[in-house]
Design a protein with these regions (language model features):
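Short, basic/aromatic recognition patches
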Residues: 33, 90-115, 143-154
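Extracellular/periplasmic juxtamembrane segments that couple receptor/chemosensory ectodomains to their
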Residues: 176-208
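Juxtamembrane extracytoplasmic/periplasmic/luminal helical "stalk" adjacent to the first N-terminal
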Residues: 1-22, 119-120
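Extracellular/periplasmic ligand-sensing ectodomains of membrane signal-transduction proteins
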Residues: 42-101, 172-174
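Solvent-exposed, extracytoplasmic
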Residues: 141-169
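Short amphipathic alpha-helical segments
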Residues: 2, 23-38, 147-151
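Conserved beta-strands of PAS-like sensory domains
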Residues: 116-150, 204-207
């Protein structure tokens, strides 16, 4: 996401210099890179797009420029089709943490009632234009697909390996005693080697 957010920051700055940024203009900027991301990662990406900063667009208080699913169709929320002013994601982790910290964040696992209605993790990275937070690029991964894809690969390296997010919540594990959503922190970390995942707010915990 780092390369994309850098490019998008430049594109948004250029677009705003010409005219006020609207939802349609933002969608046109985001769509090519959002769709390309589905094929760029060695992971089963379910959704990809950009979450606009609140009150940053000329014609809406909030907006998700988002594509998802097997058809990679654009997401249209009920609130977007009736009244865009009613979408308030200010307290949702995948928006709130990048906004407050200025750093990428992995949210979840959680049930994504807004987009997929599935057990999901969201990777989000903030986008800034001249130090102004204008939104976050993000992607969704469905937990069941990630487990099928990565667990066999992890199992080849050991029977007690876990991938955890920044607060120690398990995304997936090869251990039969740990499930997605469990936490490993504090005294539970004794006996584990921690290896950070470059470019992502994730750690791999390997039992010594």
């Amino acid at each position: 996401l780092d390369d994309w957010r850098g490019r998008l920051a430049v594109e948004i700055a250029t677009a705003r210099a010409d005219a006020p940024l609207t939802t349609d203009r933002l969608d046109a900027l985001v769509e090519p890179s959002a769709l390309a991301l589905f094929d760029q990662l060695d992971l089963p990406v379910y959704g990809s797009g950009f979450i606009a900063a609140l009150d940053s667009l000329a014609d809406a208080n909030s907006h998700l420029a988002w594509w998802q699913g097997p058809e990679r169709a654009q997401l249209v929320l009920a609130a977007q089709s009736v009244n865009k002013e009613h979408i308030d994601y200010s307290e949702l982790e995948w928006y709130r943490v990048p906004f407050q910290t200025g750093r990428p964040h992995v949210a979840g696992p959680y049930v994504d009632y807004l987009c997929s209605d599935e057990y999901t993790i969201t990777v989000a990275a903030p986008v800034h234009v001249d130090d102004e937070f204008v939104g976050a690029v993000a992607l969704d991964l469905l937990i069941d697909q990630v487990e099928r894809h990565l667990t066999p690969q992890l199992a080849a390296f050991g029977d007690d390996i876990s991938i955890v997010n920044g607060v120690g919540r398990v995304l997936l594990s090869t251990s039969p005693t740990r499930e997605t959503g469990d936490t490993i922190r504090g005294d539970d970390l004794v006996g584990f080697e921690r290896r950070p995942c470059p470019g992502m707010a994730l750690d791999v915990l390997i039992a010594r």
